[in-house]
Amino acid sequence: KKSKITFVDIDKDAVKLTKENLKLNDILLNQVYLTNSYHSNKYIKKQFYDLIFANILFNPLKKLAPLFNLIIKPNSFLILSGLLNEQIPYIINFYNKYGFKKKKIFYLNGWGSIIMKRNP
């Protein structure tokens, strides 16, 4: 089964570089949706995802929790990174309110990443 991928970045240059990297790695662009807007994008809000990976800072991650809750499939995984170590407990508690449970935490040089799973 072919997978479809959605990439979102607010930086237009990052989206351009992603396209170039996809071509270099022989990934078909018709299987990939690229955009530089996640809030107003109707395409994203109509999809349901098996995996969401977000590498952004604490405040944007808090703002995205309701959207992630709507678009992720039950029993699917959410990976959050771009967090300072001391922010990890707060973001875990915040995402718990949206039905996400912590599975694993990784720490490296003052930064942390969390793997969470969406409850059914």
Predicted regions and their residues:
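A short glycine-rich, Lys/Arg-flanked "PGG" loop and its adjoining helix->strand segment in the class I
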Residues: 62-77
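Core SAM-dependent methyltransferase catalytic element
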Residues: 101-120
